[in-house]
Amino acid sequence: MKLLENSSFEAINSLLTIETGDCKIIGRIESYSCKMAGDDKQMFKQFCQEGQPHVLEALSPPQSSGISPNKLSHSLDDGEGPLSDKCSRKTLFYLIATLNESFRPDYDFSRTKGHDFSKEPSVNWVFNAVNSSLSAAAGEAYSHLQPQLWEALDKEISLAECDIYSYNPDLDSDPYGEEGNLWSFNYFFYNKRLKRIVFFTCRSVSLFMAPRDSGIGTELDLELDEGSYEEEEEGNMDEERYGALCA
């Protein structure tokens, strides 16, 4: 997978970091070529040892489907119902390789399976889901960005021709699984004709619960620390004055 340069995406990504007072939105959009070269070919060869490229892999139902755990269990046994959505192992490899490239070098998704992904119902559904999440969290800041974002996506990947997948991992496999993460989404817009994937990932992080090493909330911590230091200094000065008077 090769990251493709896109000046429109770079401009949008600079606007997809939004602080709202109690949380911070962090998002990015990236375009990848599915043409394999070098390490990708070797990884694909190893991947195919578990099954041929044309073999279909079962996916999980979209999170929007509202399927009960009991019904989901039956679907696993029957191979029908909500898990009827499938993709070829070659497509699955593209999704995993995109994750590896996007989150490199901090995460390795080589053990990721088909059930960690879902195929979304339609472009319109994803459009509404993304807009709903970002509008609720970022308000006017996102409403100004929304037309530009979807226009750039359509120009790069031709949305009407896309199959859209999402990555919905368990907590242990989630790159956004740290304390303080409020919500996240990971969408892959795959255009088979163009041999291209656009990856749109976004999360919302609480400024009050962010881990120390995240860098989020650091300014607030510094202000509080400075305030405590000033109070301590004032206390020491009072003690010195009191000691001088007693002497």
Curated annotation (Swiss-Prot):
<dbReference type="GO" id="GO:0005737">
    <property type="term" value="C:cytoplasm"/>
</dbReference>
<dbReference type="InterPro" id="IPR015257">
    <property type="entry name" value="Maf1"/>
</dbReference>
<keyword id="KW-0678">Repressor</keyword>
<feature type="compositionally biased region" description="Acidic residues">
    <location>
        <begin position="225"/>
        <end position="237"/>
    </location>
</feature>
<keyword id="KW-0539">Nucleus</keyword>
<feature type="compositionally biased region" description="Basic and acidic residues">
    <location>
        <begin position="238"/>
        <end position="247"/>
    </location>
</feature>
<keyword id="KW-0805">Transcription regulation</keyword>
<dbReference type="GO" id="GO:0000994">
    <property type="term" value="F:RNA polymerase III core binding"/>
</dbReference>
<dbReference type="InterPro" id="IPR038564">
    <property type="entry name" value="Maf1_sf"/>
</dbReference>
<feature type="region of interest" description="Disordered">
    <location>
        <begin position="225"/>
        <end position="247"/>
    </location>
</feature>
<comment type="function">
    <text>Element of the TORC1 signaling pathway that acts as a mediator of diverse signals and that represses RNA polymerase III transcription. Inhibits the de novo assembly of TFIIIB onto DNA.</text>
</comment>
<dbReference type="GO" id="GO:0016480">
    <property type="term" value="P:negative regulation of transcription by RNA polymerase III"/>
</dbReference>
<feature type="compositionally biased region" description="Polar residues">
    <location>
        <begin position="61"/>
        <end position="73"/>
    </location>
</feature>
<keyword id="KW-0963">Cytoplasm</keyword>
<protein>
    <recommendedName>
        <fullName>Repressor of RNA polymerase III transcription MAF1 homolog</fullName>
    </recommendedName>
</protein>
<dbReference type="GO" id="GO:0005634">
    <property type="term" value="C:nucleus"/>
</dbReference>
<keyword id="KW-0804">Transcription</keyword>
<dbReference type="Pfam" id="PF09174">
    <property type="entry name" value="Maf1"/>
</dbReference>
<comment type="similarity">
    <text>Belongs to the MAF1 family.</text>
</comment>
<feature type="region of interest" description="Disordered">
    <location>
        <begin position="59"/>
        <end position="83"/>
    </location>
</feature>
